Swiss-Prot record:
This is Potassium channel toxin alpha-KTx 1.15. It holds the Pfam family Toxin_2. The record marks K47 as: Basic residue of the functional dyad. One of its GO terms (molecular function) is potassium channel regulator activity. GO terms for cellular component: extracellular region. InterPro entries: Scorpion_toxin-like_sf, Scorpion_toxinS_K_inh.
Length: 57
């Protein structure tokens, strides 16, 4: 029972990973990524991770 729950949780979490798109734009705060993501992918959904913008669809 525990294994099936863990597998289900892994599948649900991995869905979000495939929707993320990395960019080479450097950042220090997530709000710096919003115009970048809006320009590149048409949606302002993004955040700053490890000094680079990561956009979500």
């Amino acid at each position: 029972m525990k294994i099936s729950f863990l597998l289900l949780a892994l599948v649900i979490c991995s869905i979000g990973w495939s929707e993320a798109q990395f960019t080479d734009v450097k950042c220090t705060a997530s709000k710096q990524c919003w115009p970048v993501c809006n320009q590149m992918f048409g949606k302002p959904n993004g955040k700053c991770m490890n000094g680079k913008c990561r956009c979500y669809s």
